[in-house]
Amino acid sequence: NQLTAIRNFIQQEVDYIVLAPVTETGWDTVLQEAKDAGIPVIIVDRMVDVSDDSLYTAWVGSNFKLEGQKAMAWLDAYLEAKGRGDEEINLVDIQGTIGASAQIGRTQGFDDAVEAHDNWTTLAQQSGEFTQAKGQEVMESILKQSGDDIDVVYCENDNEAFGAIDAIEAAGYEVGGEEGQILVMSFDTTNAGLTDTLSGKITLDTECNPLHGPRVEEIIKK
């Protein structure tokens, strides 16, 4: 539990707290406690939604909505290049943990793109909680309902993509970008995600900036 961990750090009188929040909300009280104790808090990766921005010292993270927009712009261009720009395209969005800033931004990028295309339809949109096991479970359920109709699976991180791919292949479908296969998109570009991209199982993996650590170090040194 992140709230418990932060309070433990406050009791230990640490010099800095670096927080990568699971969700955006629910941080006001504990961050106020850290501020009252004189401990700077640096937010990393996902953002927090608080009533007073002075409760944290800095945020080092990514623009998740922009990531989603760029991924969907790539999909648009890819389908055009394949001569499928005017086809009816059915999409599945395996969302991240609901309320996390990465989920909010990447879902918004997805939703905006689908809304802008009359020939794109969202067949299902359900949280995979950013985990492989839940991603597989969600994908298995969706495949039972709509397996033959799915063109694109948009996974909001690599762990979900790994689970989705396992479910797709176990159900007898192929993953990949060619006609007749299910195209899998993902985010983060972990080492395993890059491996699946190079092998063609993931057609697009949008990188999430991995350089947060050095930037946090720079902030602390200042």
Which residues make up each language-model segment?
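A residue-level marker of the well-folded mature domains of exported/periplasmic proteins
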Residues: 1-222
